[in-house]
Amino acid sequence: MSEKLQKVLARAGHGSRREIESIIEAGRVSVDGKIATLGDRVEVTPGLKIRIDGHLISVKESAEQICRVLAYYKPEGELCTRNDPEGRPTVFDRLPKLRGARWIAVGRLDVNTCGLLLFTTDGELANRLMHPSREVEREYAVRVFGQVDESKLRDLSRGVQLEDGPAAFKTIKFSGGEGINQWYNVTLTEGRNREVRRLWEAVGVQVSRLIRVRYGDIPLPKGLPRGGWTELDLAQTNYLRGLVELPPETSSKVAVEKDRRRMKANQIRRAVKRHSQIAGGRRSGGRNNNG
């Protein structure tokens, strides 16, 4: 069965359909050696060769590809990029290896932010979840440094002007602390760059700690150590798909038994420790090379 080329490429995680349409129009995509044009349809077979900028890419039939989603506890210090030219650790380093697919990050967290980061094998799901029109809630626990009064909280709820347009927290709730070091839980329905930090800075308050604790109704899993991941079960995956009007999955790679749905904590901690040692050595080596 043939499908639109941009749909096949979006499913494989190479961008949204609109982004891929632009790539096709620019003549950057070839199918079996011929430059593709917008509107082309392809039938995914073992012999199909699709290239973007000359690089052969892997695609699968829709029926073959199971939508998988990971919840990852991103530590501070990791970059949301696949490869870093300086050799710094990235969020992709510790994810499980895949054959014939790849993990796609659902949004980004800046290098100094930790917490929940979702990954999926379904490019269309990732792009829809990230799109501002879907208004998927993101909740953050924020430790702030500075005087916070009712006037500032009111401004943050009603909206302040940032350099890229007006912004506001959907909800803001005090959650502990004393003096000028206080914790708040805030929610947003978009994912602009450093938006939480910039909102607080707009009212003269600095963020000293930032943790994403929820994406939609998916919380940061309890007991998951920093640098650890767990795969979402079928119900959670279909909840996310339903949020963005995608059809439900009918199968999952996650075992039914609860104790098999998550890597054991001690296994994850060993993996985290091992990765930290490797990353530490890599950074030391980088300093010596630059020094």
Swiss-Prot record:
Catalytic activity from the UniProt record: uridine(2605) in 23S rRNA = pseudouridine(2605) in 23S rRNA
Organism superkingdom: Bacteria
Active site: D110 (nucleophile)
Molecular functions per Gene Ontology: 23S rRNA pseudouridine(2605) synthase activity; RNA binding
Record EC number: 5.4.99.22
Keywords noted in UniProt: Isomerase, RNA-binding, rRNA processing
S4 RNA-binding domain ranges (all copies): 3-63
Top-level EC class as recorded in UniProt: isomerase
Matching Pfam families: PseudoU_synth_2 (PF00849), S4 (PF01479)
InterPro entries, per database record: PsdUridine_synth_cat_dom_sf (IPR020103), PsdUridine_synth_RsuA/RluA (IPR006145), PsdUridine_synth_RsuA/RluB/E/F (IPR000748), PsdUridine_synth_RsuA/RluB_CS (IPR018496), RsuA_PseudoU_synthase (IPR050343), S4_RNA-bd (IPR002942), S4_RNA-bd_sf (IPR036986)
GO BP, sorted A to Z: enzyme-directed rRNA pseudouridine synthesis
PROSITE patterns for this protein: PSI_RSU, S4
Protein family according to the UniProt entry: Belongs to the pseudouridine synthase RsuA family.
Function: Responsible for synthesis of pseudouridine from uracil-2605 in 23S ribosomal RNA.
Protein name, UniProt field: Ribosomal large subunit pseudouridine synthase B
Organism per entry: Salmonella typhimurium (strain LT2 / SGSC1412 / ATCC 700720)
